[in-house]
Amino acid sequence: MVDNIIDTDNYYAIVYTYKTIGLSKLYEHYIPEKDLINIRFSDTQVSLLQTCNRVELYLYTKDRNKINDILSKLNETHGKDISSNAIVLRGKDAINHLYQVASGLDSLAIGEYEILGQIKEALTSCKKHSLCNEEIELLFNAAIKVGRKVRSLTNISKGKVGIYSIAIQKSLEVMGDLTDIKIAIVGAGEIGSKLAFMLKNNGARNLTIFNRNLDRALELSNKFGYNAELLDFQKVNEYDLVFIAINNSNPSQLRLDKPKLVIDLSVPPVVYKTSNVIYLDDLRVISDNIILNKREDIKKAEAIINEEIQKFESLLNNYNMNRLVSRFMSEIEWVREKEVDRAFNEILKNYADKDNIKEIIDKMTYSLIKKVFSPILEDLRKDPNNKKQIVEYLIEVFQNGQFSDTKTQKIEKQ
């Protein structure tokens, strides 16, 4: 049996999301990049998709026990049991889940676009650290294509669907015109950058970016023509509209009572809940109402996903067949080269023009193999599902690159 065949049953997903454990506890499951490198086993591929809504590991392994080993490693690196509330998906279920995520169906805000970029970044990261190979790459690239297809064939992403778009929309409802409002963004990371861009498009002019790292705040503020300051929540409290999006490892909360509106997107929240504060969970309620209005689009998207899962299986079948054919032809080429050398040595006994003789034999044998095997291989490629075993059998006959001694002796006698 050939070892490098891709099997859908070898795909796994270890899932923690806002749906399964809640946003308030999700941060406890975050996996630092250095820990991801440590938990990965040599014969297991892994990619981490980690956002404010989810912590998900996508894996490819032929050994089911490796999943339990990785869960144990997660417990070890976190210093507590986090494996008991993990959802483990396998095969088509894991593929379906990633497709749902890529399509925006499993997002806090239905149809959001941001997730496609996050999936692409997850793939780039795992390749950069040599944590995954083509098996994961094929799946992630397919998921990105599915996400784009769903958005092009449905209205799932039409309107204000992204969580940050909903946050901006809520601020417009409460504050009205943003042109002269004093606005603060706490955090200069990916979310802070998106908020700054969207607020710029909505007319915000008097905006300051606060961050623990002033250089990062300056870099972002200069991009949009805003102000930048080192993070000081006493100063932040003097603004009319405040957005907060920072990594918060401290469960204690502070109060911001002067702003008219505070939208805290941090997990867990930074600010104590009062009447002027909106959490990520509050935006989720708005998102749920959007979902109710997009039920028909969700049905269409799910139908597309089911169809694309079948296409992915066909893609793998064709991919596997091409691998088998390539392997088979390499075995044939090995035999051909050996026969050329043997014939060449025989001819040398009677002829002196070595270069011309070997070129003639080489062209002759190559042409012979091509003529013999091209019709066979074309027929095999037409039906990869049912004829894969034939190619595997042919490879086994050659016994990983060489005829057995018994077969070789029989051929030489002939």
Curated annotation (Swiss-Prot):
Gene3D superfamilies: Glutamyl-tRNA reductase, N-terminal domain, NAD(P)-binding Rossmann-like Domain. It is an enzyme of class 1 (oxidoreductase). The active site is at C52. Keywords: NADP, Oxidoreductase, Porphyrin biosynthesis. The record marks H97 as: Important for activity. It catalyses: (S)-4-amino-5-oxopentanoate + tRNA(Glu) + NADP(+) = L-glutamyl-tRNA(Glu) + NADPH + H(+). One of its GO terms (biological process) is protoporphyrinogen IX biosynthetic process from glutamate. HAMAP family: Glu_tRNA_reductase. Catalyzes the NADPH-dependent reduction of glutamyl-tRNA(Glu) to glutamate 1-semialdehyde (GSA). This is Glutamyl-tRNA reductase. It comes from Sulfolobus acidocaldarius (strain ATCC 33909 / DSM 639 / JCM 8929 / NBRC 15157 / NCIMB 11770). The gene is hemA.
